[in-house]
């Protein structure tokens, strides 16, 4: 039931007090011809409606959320408390810089900490998400070569295991995307060697990659990329695996984007809010978006980089997310962040060892923070697909993994338990997944018609795609 269906004419949740300010009528050209179709509900109606929806929803506060490549870790409530402090909550981006020195200091110090973590020289906090960070990075790449008069570089190389946003971001900027083949789940260095030429502007990599494998040839890849005059771009989606262990800048990357909403523990999902800062090495600092924050004596001020690509987001990005990430970093400290990565890798390998007993692991061996299993054998022998397995998992009150990604693995299940789950939770999740796989052989129709216990049963995704309904009509 929607909030509109609870509506009863004349029902009110509150009424405004009488005002001694004289009434003023807007010119007719600004007025609606008909009243807006807003629901008329009481306060209990509203509270019960949204409480009911919240109970039907699932979040990391309710249980494990092992979406691969999403880092759905538990988000400490302290972060929310700090972001809700009046000094952060009540400010406005149009205020003079001298009246928001605390906020500017926070942004400056956050930049400094993120640069130290990644090995970059400067950073912008403007981008609102990871893909937005990619787009910003690609704009910097384009402007960098344009400023050098090197306009023949039209290609960006992307591995076949990459996030789909990588080729999309490069294409949006006008680059031609060329795919690099994988060998044993990692970049095929020989194939990369064939593709690198004077037309290549950048190579985009995720390390660890989307299979949860560390690109062991990264130093060689960086050397090859730079020898041909191209830039090396780091998709920071999987930084949670290597904090305190290795830095993208030390691997040879020129540009890096981060996902503060993932690695640095701020709530995300359903489209946001996110934050995708972009860090660069010295030769690219002047191309960062404006405004940037710098320290001038005892004060913090805004400035415009000399060769800036311009704004990429209104004002200063998603500022509350920056506050939460800043809080998380200070709370964890250097040793704590390193421990985060150690536990993320340990949990992933423990869970993989459990799951490999009943599902195939195409690229087996030591993984980093996540791993990819395959239900291809299950599908061949039972007709049950990965999608059916994911839907059935919902009946056990937990969230399924990412499915059908990366594309180079058939019937893929991409699993990232994160560092915040304990052994008991991992054991229970493996037990549920094993039970579901067993059901696929014993009673496949149970999976093909799942879920059975959720408020909404299986949605007709084809119909939803072809005939979407975006608004309510009574």
Curated annotation (Swiss-Prot):
MF-aspect GO terms: glycine binding; glycine dehydrogenase (decarboxylating) activity; pyridoxal phosphate binding
Record-linked Gene3D superfamilies: 6.20.440.10, Aspartate Aminotransferase, domain 1, Type I PLP-dependent aspartate aminotransferase-like (Major domain)
Positions of disulphide bridges: none
Pfam family, one: GDC-P
Enzyme Commission (EC) number: 1.4.4.2
UniProt cofactor(s): pyridoxal 5'-phosphate
GO cellular component: cytosol; glycine cleavage complex
Substrates-to-products reaction catalysed: N(6)-[(R)-lipoyl]-L-lysyl-[glycine-cleavage complex H protein] + glycine + H(+) = N(6)-[(R)-S(8)-aminomethyldihydrolipoyl]-L-lysyl-[glycine-cleavage complex H protein] + CO2
Any Gene Ontology biological process: glycine decarboxylation via glycine cleavage system
UniProt keyword list: Oxidoreductase, Pyridoxal phosphate
Record-listed N6-(pyridoxal phosphate)lysine modification sites: 262
Keyword Oxidoreductase belongs to the record: yes
Main function: The glycine cleavage system catalyzes the degradation of glycine. The P protein binds the alpha-amino group of glycine through its pyridoxal phosphate cofactor; CO(2) is released and the remaining methylamine moiety is then transferred to the lipoamide cofactor of the H protein.
Subunit composition and interactions: The glycine cleavage system is composed of four proteins: P, T, L and H. In this organism, the P 'protein' is a heterodimer of two subunits.
Family according to the record: Belongs to the GcvP family. C-terminal subunit subfamily.
Name the record gives this protein: Probable glycine dehydrogenase (decarboxylating) subunit 2
The gene coding this protein: gcvPB
